[in-house]
Amino acid sequence: MFAIAPADPDSPDARVLLAELGAALAHITGSDGSASFDAADVRGPRACFLVARAADGSLAGCGALRSLTDDVAELKRMYARPGSGAGAGAALLAALERQALAFGYRDVWLETRRVNARAVAFYEKHGYRVIHNFGKYAGRPEAVCLGKRPDTRAPVFL
């Protein structure tokens, strides 16, 4: 069981998780991904940054949503800390999808690198499908974009 709550992306806990995510991404892809994340994007209306904690209170992961279009939220900085317990990533993803629906988005899109096979498999397992590369990812063969229309019958989390 995980407690998931909004947090400031510049909070000490968020900075720890984002630094770990950056190091993991740099190891897998050669880039920490920080150039594609602006904390201001997840502070505005119809945006959020969430932190997950395990039952013992330890940090388990983070994730964010930002507005891409009126109908589409972009998932950013999704990270489940290794050793945080089974289900941290799934719990965070479900919370972010519920929040996207609460904000009025129809779809959730994201980008990751093709070489990050574990992430691609995780999202596909949770119903995401490969879509056209959008925005700055268009024409970039190393990028893979995925999207999903979340279940509108799920209860709102936040």
Question: What is the predicted role of each segment?
Answer:
Residues S36-A40, H132-F134:
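Short, P/G- and charge-enriched loop/turn segments at secondary-structure junctions
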Residues F2-A3, P9-D10, R106-W109, R113-A121, ...:
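C-terminal "cap" of GNAT-fold acetyltransferases
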Residues A40-V51:
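A short helix-loop-beta-strand connector motif used in the catalytic cores of GNAT acetyltransferases and
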Residues R66, D71-P82, E111:
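Conserved acetyl-CoA binding element of GNAT-fold acetyltransferases
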Residues A80, G85-R98, K125:
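Conserved acetyl-CoA-binding loop-helix of GNAT-fold acetyltransferases
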Residues M1-G33, P155:
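Short amphipathic alpha-helix that is part of the acyltransferase structural core
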Residues F49-V51, S58-R66, E74:
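Conserved beta-strand in the GNAT
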